[in-house]
């Protein structure tokens, strides 16, 4: 079957970007245009000859526009197989004329539910019924019908029509049809997630639909022999994308490992959004230094002093605009990526002198809600993001001694960081600065040893520090080792069958200890 010449088009769009120019071109090629509601008005106001869909159906739009395109003369005109004699006869007998092109985009359901004050009724009214039905009918009959859901495709269709005798190619029609089913799948996923949330359904659904759309290509993955890319993801809770949150201002393309480190660094710095100046230094997704101080430069100096070797080639995130004093301090070493919510005047000029350094602007906070997906050889693990954080008033003091105000501030600082470190985690903190980071060890005792060793390597005195453990101390030995190092207060989830032994050891060493009741394993 040859490519069918486009003679009749049905146009009904919520996003009217480019639609007037598109239809003006169609009309100039002799295409008959039918439309609905606001789209029809926009075309007629622009002087384009377009007729109401009611001309085809013989039926008015009713029920506040809920019913206008759900009609056999519409779907028969879309679904009829053009070279099928029975279909042709049925069309003649029922007064159905073929529709060759459909340009439809859907009611903005996702944008509607993203509004903070949206009502359930408003959300429901933004569920498109006729649009998806027309799109799916047209896409099914892609051998004969061209279907457009994206204004970016208008030019492609027009160019092909001009060079192909008023028709599009089969390849283009198939490509556009595939976009339809991707769109309607994502659309229905968003509606299903919203309905489930409105009904109070919690936990992962029995079936989940996730749309991935390539956003960035990458030279390779974690290692040069692995191919990779970054994909926008829509899991029904809205689309998550790098470009919506970040903007690379300088430097070569970001790698797979860079993306992991950016996620890790900004995940920690988000904990201190709105607080006093804070700096996070990350290497291989684990923090090697985190600190708060009255100035950003002082916070950076403190974070750097935790580990004076690891920051080379590392990733640094700031919770305040990067100022010149801090930029000069950072410029003393090579760092691979700097991430900030803004860069003060002159800072970019200074930092851009090192061409291998990437500078990244964080335009908005990271989304906290949603699901986390981890691929395994035997399936996809799905869990709710670990976004819950214990408040100071929720801490349970289990020792005879209460933590002082200063200890409590350090304990909360440590707990915000500990949950972002690979388990097993032991973290020493003093004066809102990491003093020793023990990460990713199979034994909690080994993590503690590493943390103490790292502190001693740079001459940081643990006397008067606090310690955080991402999971409970299974025995008193870990706590006793911390006490021996000079710790005065402890924060941990609790929950061990030997909690009493650990509490007794804390009391015996005059330690203040609080339980969070919330474990933060990170694998």
From Swiss-Prot:
PROSITE patterns: MGS. Coiled coil: none annotated. GO terms for biological process: 'de novo' IMP biosynthetic process. The keyword Transferase applies. The keyword Transferase applies. It catalyses: (6R)-10-formyltetrahydrofolate + 5-amino-1-(5-phospho-beta-D-ribosyl)imidazole-4-carboxamide = 5-formamido-1-(5-phospho-D-ribosyl)imidazole-4-carboxamide + (6S)-5,6,7,8-tetrahydrofolate; IMP + H2O = 5-formamido-1-(5-phospho-D-ribosyl)imidazole-4-carboxamide. Its EC number is 2.1.2.3, 3.5.4.10. Pathway: Purine metabolism; IMP biosynthesis via de novo pathway; 5-formamido-1-(5-phospho-D-ribosyl)imidazole-4-carboxamide from 5-amino-1-(5-phospho-D-ribosyl)imidazole-4-carboxamide (10-formyl THF route): step 1/1; Purine metabolism; IMP biosynthesis via de novo pathway; IMP from 5-formamido-1-(5-phospho-D-ribosyl)imidazole-4-carboxamide: step 1/1. Residues 1-149 form the MGS-like domain. GO terms for molecular function: IMP cyclohydrolase activity; phosphoribosylaminoimidazolecarboxamide formyltransferase activity. Pfam families: AICARFT_IMPCHas, MGS. Keywords: Hydrolase, Multifunctional enzyme, Purine biosynthesis, Transferase. One of its GO terms (cellular component) is cytosol. The IMP cyclohydrolase activity resides in the N-terminal region. PANTHER family: BIFUNCTIONAL PURINE BIOSYNTHESIS PROTEIN ATIC (PTHR11692:SF0), BIFUNCTIONAL PURINE BIOSYNTHESIS PROTEIN PURH (PTHR11692). Belongs to the PurH family. This is Bifunctional purine biosynthesis protein PurH. It comes from Chlorobaculum parvum (strain DSM 263 / NCIMB 8327) (Chlorobium vibrioforme subsp. thiosulfatophilum).
């Amino acid at each position: 079957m040859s490519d069918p010449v486009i003679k009749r088009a049905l146009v009904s769009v919520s996003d009217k970007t480019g639609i007037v120019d598109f239809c003006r071109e169609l009309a100039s090629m002799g295409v008959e245009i039918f439309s609905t509601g606001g789209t029809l008005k926009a075309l007629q106001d622009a002087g384009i000859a377009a007729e109401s869909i009611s001309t085809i159906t013989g039926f008015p739009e009713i029920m506040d526009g809920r019913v206008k395109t759900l009609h056999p003369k519409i779907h028969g005109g879309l679904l009829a197989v053009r070279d099928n004699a029975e279909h042709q006869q049925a069309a003649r007998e029922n007064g159905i004329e073929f529709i060759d092109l459909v340009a439809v985009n859907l009611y903005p359901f996702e944008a509607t539910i993203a509004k903070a004050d949206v009502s359930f009724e408003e959300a429901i009214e933004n569920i498109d019924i006729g649009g998806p039905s027309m799109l799916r009918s047209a896409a099914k009959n892609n051998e004969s019908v061209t279907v457009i859901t994206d204004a970016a495709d208008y030019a492609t269709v027009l160019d092909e029509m001009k060079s192909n005798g008023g028709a599009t190619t089969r390849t283009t029609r198939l490509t556009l049809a595939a976009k339809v089913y991707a769109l309607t799948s994502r659309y229905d996923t968003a509606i299903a997630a919203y309905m489930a949330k409105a009904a109070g359904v919690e936990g992962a659904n029995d079936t989940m639909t996730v749309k991935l759309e390539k956003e960035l290509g990458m030279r390779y993955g974690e290692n040069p022999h692995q191919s990779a890319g970054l994909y926008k993801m829509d899991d029904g809770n809205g689309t998550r994308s790098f470009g919506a949150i970040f903007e690379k201002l300088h430097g070569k393309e970001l790698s797979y490992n860079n993306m992991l480190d950016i996620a890790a660094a900004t995940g920690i710095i988000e904990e201190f959004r709105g607080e006093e100046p804070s700096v996070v230094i990350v290497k291989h997704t684990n923090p090697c230094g985190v600190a708060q101080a009255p100035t950003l430069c002082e916070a950076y100096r403190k974070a750097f002093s935790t580990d004076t070797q690891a920051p080379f080639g590392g990733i640094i995130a700031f919770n305040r605009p990067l100022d010149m004093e801090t930029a000069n301090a950072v410029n003393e070493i090579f760092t691979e990526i700097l991430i900030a919510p803004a860069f003060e005047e002159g800072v970019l000029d200074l930092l851009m002198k090192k061409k291998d350094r990437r500078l990244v602007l964080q335009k908005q906070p990271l989304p906290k809600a949603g699901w986390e997906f981890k691929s395994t050889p035997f399936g996809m693990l799905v869990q709710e993001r670990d976004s819950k954080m214990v408040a100071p008033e929720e801490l349970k003091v289990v020792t005879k001694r209460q933590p002082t105000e200063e200890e409590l501030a350090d304990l909360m600082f440590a707990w915000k960081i500990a949950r972002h470190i690979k388990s097993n985690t032991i973290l020493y903190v003093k004066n809102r600065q990491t003093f020793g980071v023990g990460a990713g060890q199979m034994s909690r005792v080994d993590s503690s040893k590493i943390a103490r060793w790292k502190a001693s390597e740079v001459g940081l005195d643990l006397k008067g520090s606090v310690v955080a453990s991402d999971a409970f101390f299974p025995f008193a030995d870990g706590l006793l080792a911390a006490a021996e190092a000079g710790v005065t207060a402890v924060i941990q989830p609790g929950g061990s069958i030997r909690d009493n032994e650990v509490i007794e050891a804390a009391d015996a060493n005059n330690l203040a200890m609080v339980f969070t009741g919330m474990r933060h394993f990170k694998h």
